Amino acid sequence: MKKKLYEGSSKILYSAEEDFLLIMAFSDKAVLETGETVDISGKGVLNNSISSFLMGKLEMIGIENHLIEKINMREQLIQYVEVFPIQVIISSVACGRFVKEFGMDEGYVFDKPIIDFKVRSREFNYPIVNEYQIFNFGWLTMDEIRTVQAQTLRIYDFLSGLFIGIGIRLVECKLEFGRVFNGEESIIMLTDEISPDNCRLWHINSNEKLGFELIENEPNKAFESYQLIANRLKEK
């Protein structure tokens, strides 16, 4: 029987039979900015499908990631990764904190994508951290930071093109990385998920918000939004 190891806001990790592998299950839960938890029935199934598809596409262009296989409607078999204590947020358009903290007009297009790092800590409200702090805190080496930045840009460029092809704009994406060890050597690997839960996705023509942004404002429309994204990706 599999053992529950960790439960987050939208995913649960279980032990697997093989060493260094885990089972990741997608739930229907979503945590609002207020801290309230809501259920969007069927969201987990769609996120599993979307993330499996996108991770598979990234593997094809040489981006190492934790996905081994999708094993059922809600679960994936994944590689164990020693996850870095940071989130990597890449934005090509003013949204979220750029509007709230800098007073920018939502939708303003940056000349180049902006990469931010945040500490993976709900307790401390995910504070922004810079690369020199990350290095001096002993979390990543400078070479690892550069690798993460380069991979983030490559991932974002690829996904942006893929989403444009289905009439959707990838405005922002939150990524997580970690180390996988092979003896004394290690490689940096993409982990967590890529889904409407951690990507800001807008209709390319109308800028209508899709995915998690709808859960905050129009939760009754959220499932249809996730389903639209999944259906369009199936056609690729």
Curated annotation (Swiss-Prot):
GO annotation, biological process: 'de novo' IMP biosynthetic process; cobalamin biosynthetic process
Gene3D superfamilies in the cross-refs: ATP-grasp fold, B domain, Phosphorylase Kinase, domain 1
Catalytic activity: 5-amino-1-(5-phospho-D-ribosyl)imidazole-4-carboxylate + L-aspartate + ATP = (2S)-2-[5-amino-1-(5-phospho-beta-D-ribosyl)imidazole-4-carboxamido]succinate + ADP + phosphate + 2 H(+)
An example Gene Ontology molecular-function term: ATP binding
SUPFAM superfamilies reported for this sequence: SAICAR synthase-like
Keyword Ligase: yes
Keyword set, alphabetical order: ATP-binding, Ligase, Nucleotide-binding, Purine biosynthesis
GO annotations of cellular component type: cytosol
One Pfam family, short name: SAICAR_synt
Signal peptide annotation: none
Pathway given in the UniProt record: Purine metabolism; IMP biosynthesis via de novo pathway; 5-amino-1-(5-phospho-D-ribosyl)imidazole-4-carboxamide from 5-amino-1-(5-phospho-D-ribosyl)imidazole-4-carboxylate: step 1/2
Enzyme Commission number(s) of this protein: 6.3.2.6
Domain of life (superkingdom): Bacteria
Keyword Transmembrane included in the entry's annotation: no
Family stated for the protein in its record: Belongs to the SAICAR synthetase family.
Name this protein carries in UniProt: Phosphoribosylaminoimidazole-succinocarboxamide synthase
Organism listed in the record: Rickettsia typhi (strain ATCC VR-144 / Wilmington)
Gene: purC
